[in-house]
Design a protein with these regions (language model features):
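Glycine-/charge-enriched secondary-structure boundary and capping motifs
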Residues: 1-126
Length: 126
């Protein structure tokens, strides 16, 4: 588990995947985005830190076929981001049930899965 601040979602995913010896497969269409942020990213209006974050980890990310604005959003240097949790597949149902019971299920999304380590730590999928 980590909080998404400073390094953007992809930066934190790279750190977690590297430390765990795995590859994260993220589905860009399953990630929630603020609509205004999407529009700004499509216009190229992103924080300068986005480019620094991209430079840090772009070599670890397979983004083939993914539109550029998604990358800008995923490298965005959040200062008040959410939490990223990696949970064993067999524990996912229990976790989702417990989150729902506690009233925080509306802010929960499954955005990908973990695969054996490959040449890239992150694989972005549509």
């Amino acid at each position: 588990c980590t909080d998404i601040t400073g390094f953007g979602l992809l930066g934190h995913c790279v750190e977690m995947a590297s430390a765990s010896g795995v590859t994260f497969e993220l589905k860009v269409n399953d990630i929630a985005y603020f609509q205004d942020a999407v529009e700004y990213a499509k216009m190229g209006l992103v924080p300068a830190g986005t480019y620094k974050n991209r430079g840090y980890s772009i070599g670890s990310v397979d983004a083939q076929g993914i539109e550029e604005f998604y990358l800008d959003l995923l490298y965005d240097p959040q200062t008040s981001g959410g939490l990223l949790l990696s949970v064993a597949r067999e524990d996912l149902g229990t976790l989702l049930s417990e989150l729902k019971a506690s009233g925080i299920d509306t802010a929960v999304s499954v955005i990908g899965s973990v695969a054996p380590e490959s040449d890239k730590l992150i694989r972005l999928l549509k």
